[in-house]
Amino acid sequence: DKYIALGEWAGCFGIKEKDIDKDLVI
């Protein structure tokens, strides 16, 4: 279930996911 949720979330946000990833890294 978690894998599917992450897949849908990543698909919906797409580019935004990268922005959030950078925020998490920083």
From Swiss-Prot:
It is found in: Secreted, Extracellular space, Extracellular matrix, Basement membrane. Keywords: Basement membrane, Calcium, Copper, Extracellular matrix, Secreted. GO terms for cellular component: basement membrane; extracellular region. The lineage of its organism: Eukaryota, Metazoa, Chordata, Craniata, Vertebrata. The keyword Nucleotidyltransferase does not apply. It comes from the Eukaryota. Appears to regulate cell growth through interactions with the extracellular matrix and cytokines. Binds calcium and copper, several types of collagen, albumin, thrombospondin, PDGF and cell membranes. There are two calcium binding sites; an acidic domain that binds 5 to 8 Ca(2+) with a low affinity and an EF-hand loop that binds a Ca(2+) ion with a high affinity. It comes from Neovison vison. Belongs to the SPARC family. The keyword Calcium applies. This is SPARC.
